């Protein structure tokens, strides 16, 4: 068993937007949704954008009017191919497969207490595996975990241990999480932000990146 220190960074993918999709019984990876309070005018900040909507190069933290303009531009480009639109849809796969559909999206009003409830439920999953002293909360949707003492305890590789946890999060809450594993906290964070988030989700719905000092020099 590898005795090298191992740390994990775990991020809940487009957390607020994913929760809103799940509450509507929609797939976060296939639903165009933005979390924003429309009652505050179109200058309000978009708190989260679903993974499906992000695939159109729409980032989070835009103001709502900027999102509206970006979607108008996307639909203008779609019309160059389609010539006309037969309907408006927020279903990502249908939009990909049918250029005659106008890209639409759901605007969900933020529900912070609900997001906190989901975050607490996921934190309880971490507590099933780790002592609280080894879990470092970075934000409502991101944690760092010192895996070092648990690899030997569970007789699992760091990858397999984190894979089990991400799968349990997905099974319990339907939220996809991405993770980075590294030989220090910095490398774990970089593995998550640069490697895991840019790779395709595997057949089990998981994204895990890994970096040690040698791989960091080689890949980055």
Which residue stretches match the model-derived regions?
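Short, surface-exposed alpha-helical recognition segments that flank or form part
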Residues: 114, 156-157
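Long, highly charged, low-complexity intrinsically disordered interaction regions
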Residues: 157-220
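Active-site-proximal beta-alpha loop/turn segments in soluble metabolic enzymes
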Residues: 143-152, 186, 220
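Residues that scaffold, gate, or flank divalent-cation-dependent active/transport sites
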Residues: 1-140, 144, 151, 193-194
